[in-house]
Amino acid sequence: MCAVALTVLGLAILFSSTVSLKADPYFFIKRQLVFVGLAVALGWVVSRLDLEYLRPYSWIIAGVAALALLAVLIPGIGVRVNGARRWVELGLMRGQPSELAKLAMVFALAHYCGINQRHMPSLVRGFIVPCAGIGLFGLLIIAEPDFGTAALTGVVGFAMLFLGGARLRYMVPTALGGLGLFALAVWHDPVRFGRITAFLDVEANRADGAYQLFQAILAFASGGLDGVGLGNGRQQMAFLPEAHTDFIFAIVGEELGLWFTLAAVTAFAVLFCAGLAHLRRAPNLFGYLLMAGSLLLLALQSLINLGVVTGSLPTKGMSLPFISYGGSNLLLMGIIIGLVFNTRREWSRPNLAPKRALMEVSA
């Protein structure tokens, strides 16, 4: 129900924030309704699949995802938007391979840890090999460039290794080294480094680097407790760039007020906690890690978007699950919800005796 409520909220705010952007006031809402229908259909299919049967195909799924990320970098196939090549043309629609690649990595990593459960404490099979896979996906995403999604992918991958039983003595130095390299890459990128300096002093940079964030803060301030009313916000009139995508939560705050923003955050929290409560019934390490990784994708992406829009994190283009306009992320969320229903049905069978899913983590 939380996912449905968030999607309905997203449709209402999307229509309000895009009604004046095109000659056809229903242009965006019609496309989003198509995406919602596809996400529901895909989620239903996933909820009926036998995930154990699909496990051997996880390498193929991951390989296809990696090829799709490579295709994005090929001129003529990949589409450059706002200086980044993250999209591919799919007939009349565009797709963002990095969205579905995140889940492909989760699926493959869960399968790998499951079949190598006894070897997860080892250096090579338990750490170096899976890290190479995580690193490959991360590098392909950085090449777009998309540092935020690459960081999200790396964090989720490392969390899964930790839950799968990889040794902290290998993980901690590698994580610190990776964080240092990531910071160095950002420092050498004028655009992304500029976002950080603008974030640190929004008032001084409100005319350029922090303009978008400044307008988002104004939107929240204008909305107050009860909002100015659906369709009555000023930020929908092109003051706030990307108001219907990455910064749509600011429109929620302006038009519906603090109470609705708190309700939306609560819905995300309930959705995540409900999934966590279900993890204890996982019959094996594969199921445990697949669900844990999927929930982490949902939770971290939500937290990053909310942090950016409220000025708690530097500006980063990342969709808000269920609410932002866009098909790729909505399909990803449909798959994740389908996985939740799938595991809920499969793990609730009375004759299914849960086995130990989480290995002891050794330092």
Give residue ranges: language-model regions.
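Short, small-residue-rich loop/turn micro-motifs
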Residues: 13, 220, 224, 310
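Transmembrane alpha-helices of multi-pass inner-membrane enzymes
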Residues: 313-356
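Glycine/serine-rich anion-binding loops at beta->alpha junctions
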Residues: 91-101, 143-145, 224-229, 318-330
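Transmembrane helix boundary and interhelical junction motifs in multipass membrane proteins
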Residues: 146-151, 227-233, 243-245, 262, ...
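Hydrophobic alpha-helical transmembrane segments of multi-pass inner membrane proteins, especially
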Residues: 2-16, 21-214, 250-308, 335-339, ...
